[in-house]
Design a protein with these regions (language model features):
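A charged N-terminal "starter" segment
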Residues: 1-119, 124-136
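Conserved anion-binding
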Residues: 115-116, 122-166
Length: 166
């Protein structure tokens, strides 16, 4: 995106500062570059990183998947699919949206239940909570794996141990 100094000044005057300018073409290019580099990976965009509905819409239109951590984040994504035929909408929810908050509030699970979401869990207690408050959810067990050689140790933070998974 090329903006002249005068254009930036005018935008600041018209909209006040601070002012955030988002180039949706750059978002699309970055997404395509990522998919080209890792074609078999289905990455999920963390909506909490930037929940701007226009960014989510841009990513939706180019086939992105979404990681949501709250009901409002889910609804930002859902706005893009609410008018799809029912089966297509449900297929999108199961294939392209995952509720992966590590601490799942029972209220949020109840709000999500009618949408039959895909939900991660790390242990048997979480699975029981999901079953009670969001019985229509699909579930995905998050596995804790060693990350030997990583610069930042995160493997002890999330997921079930191998012995717990069986």
């Amino acid at each position: 995106m090329v903006l002249q100094k005068l254009s930036l000044q005018r935008l600041a005057e018209d909209n006040s500062t601070p002012l955030l300018i988002i180039d949706h073409e750059t978002i699309r290019e970055n997404y395509r570059s990522f998919k080209d580099a890792l074609p078999r990976v289905q990455a999920y965009y963390a909506v909490k990183a930037n929940s701007d509905p226009e960014i989510v819409k841009t990513l939706y239109k180019i086939g992105a998947s979404f990681d949501v951590a709250s009901f409002p984040e889910f609804m930002i994504v859902y706005e893009n699919i609410k008018n799809l035929p029912e089966k297509e909408r449900q297929d999108f929810i199961w294939d392209k949206i995952i509720y992966a908050n590590t601490i799942k509030q029972t209220k949020t699970l109840g709000e999500l239940d009618p949408y039959k979401p895909l939900v991660t869990y790390d242990n048997i207690d979480e699975l029981k909570k999901i079953k009670e408050h969001c019985p229509h959810a699909g579930v995905v067990l998050r596995i804790r794996v060693p990350n030997t050689g990583s610069m930042v140790e995160l493997s002890s933070k999330f997921g079930a141990l191998r012995r717990e998974a069986f």
